[in-house]
């Protein structure tokens, strides 16, 4: 996609950066639509379904919402537009559709079908492909993986402020949480409670932003947990709980690969306990920083408040009792817990407001999804 845009000379650097980011997330809807199947089969099983869901997700929960039509149309071809008697909705979307086609034939070692390409895409795209391949050798780069380094170098042109970083983290967190509607508000709740607790602890604004990012990423490892376990309508078996526990280590490993060590530790070690009985590493005492303690307590509170198919959320009195018992057993920080209890109503009210806003957008998105499927099916 990047090389095709370069040789077309139709796009500014800023546009290319944003469209490339969108392209990376082009199948984000498949994560929801085909969550119980192999995601690689999404293009075959439900191409329009996951394109529509992905587009609405980007529109509602992404800092790149202006580019949502690129995702919406990334399976549209000239033949599709002709059959549906529609004008081209998004030129970058059609180019992404062509890029997706190239990727599929390269992965499967197929030969390009020139007649098929001419039927489905503007003839200009073949010229762009040949020129880009000649200049940048992207066919071989796709095969041997060198394209990753090229993309990373290109993205060095991208400036992202703290607010945008938080927005991207929210997008990633929502993509994971929306797999299961039982857990859809959990991450927002953890972020909101963490922010309020950090303020009460007189943490600097810069560190509060860091804590919010970590709270948003705290369950990133659940991307590897089977949906059947995440949505199980009852208590997990010992074996299932061991699988669920693995999300901490998976998240730790993911963020380690990104060289985000402080974010990694605050985000993914929220199941560690002060007495060393937690997981995945059995840290204890001073090995668990203030920021880690804040996210850990926020995660516990969110879990206690949250309703699931098999349980109602606990009452204020029950939650306070459980937290105090954990303090006595040296599981969680005494001072942070006391701050929460003393400010319970305010903190929970702020968290509930954050959740209500997100859930309203999510509900509207689901309704629009059904409407758009009728239009584009």
Residue ranges of each PLM-predicted region?
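Histidine- and acidic-residue-rich, metal-dependent catalytic cores
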Residues: 1-377
């Amino acid at each position: 996609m990047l090389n095709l845009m370069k040789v077309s000379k139709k796009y500014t650097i800023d546009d290319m950066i944003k469209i490339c980011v969108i392209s990376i997330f082009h199948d984000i809807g498949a994560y929801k639509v085909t969550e119980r199947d192999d995601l690689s089969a999404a293009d075959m099983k439900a191409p329009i379904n996951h394109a529509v869901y992905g587009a609405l997700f980007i529109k509602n929960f992404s800092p790149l919402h202006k580019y949502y039509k690129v995702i919406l149309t990334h399976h549209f071809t000239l033949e599709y537009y002709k059959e549906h008697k529609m004008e081209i909705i998004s030129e970058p979307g059609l180019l992404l559709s062509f890029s997706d086609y190239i990727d599929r034939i390269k992965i499967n070692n197929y030969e390009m079908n020139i007649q098929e390409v001419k039927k489905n895409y503007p003839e200009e795209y073949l010229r762009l492909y040949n020129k880009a391949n000649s200049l940048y050798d992207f066919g071989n780069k796709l095969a041997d993986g060198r394209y990753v380094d090229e993309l990373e170098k290109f993205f060095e042109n991208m400036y992202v402020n703290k607010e945008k970083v938080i927005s991207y983290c929210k997008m990633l967190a929502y993509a994971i949480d929306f797999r299961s509607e039982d857990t859809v508000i959990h991450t927002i709740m953890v972020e909101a409670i963490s922010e309020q607790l950090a303020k009460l602890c007189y943490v600097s604004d810069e560190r509060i932003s860091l804590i919010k990012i970590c709270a948003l990423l705290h369950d990133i490892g659940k991307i590897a947990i089977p949906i059947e376990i995440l949505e199980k309508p009852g208590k997990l078996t010992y074996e299932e709980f061991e699988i669920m526990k693995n999300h901490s280590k998976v998240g730790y490993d993911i963020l380690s690969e990104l060289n985000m060590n402080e974010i990694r530790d605050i985000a993914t070690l929220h199941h560690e306990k002060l007495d060393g009985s937690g997981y995945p590493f059995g840290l204890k005492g001073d090995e668990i920083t203030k920021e880690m303690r804040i996210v850990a307590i926020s995660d516990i509170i969110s879990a206690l408040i949250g309703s699931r198919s098999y349980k109602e959320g606990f009452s204020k009195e029950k939650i306070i009792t459980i937290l105090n018992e954990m303090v006595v057993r040296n599981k969680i920080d005494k001072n942070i817990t006391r701050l929460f209890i003393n400010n319970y109503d305010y903190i929970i009210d702020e968290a509930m407001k954050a959740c209500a806003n997100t859930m309203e957008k999510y509900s509207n998105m689901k309704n629009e999804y059904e409407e758009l499927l009728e239009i584009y099916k």
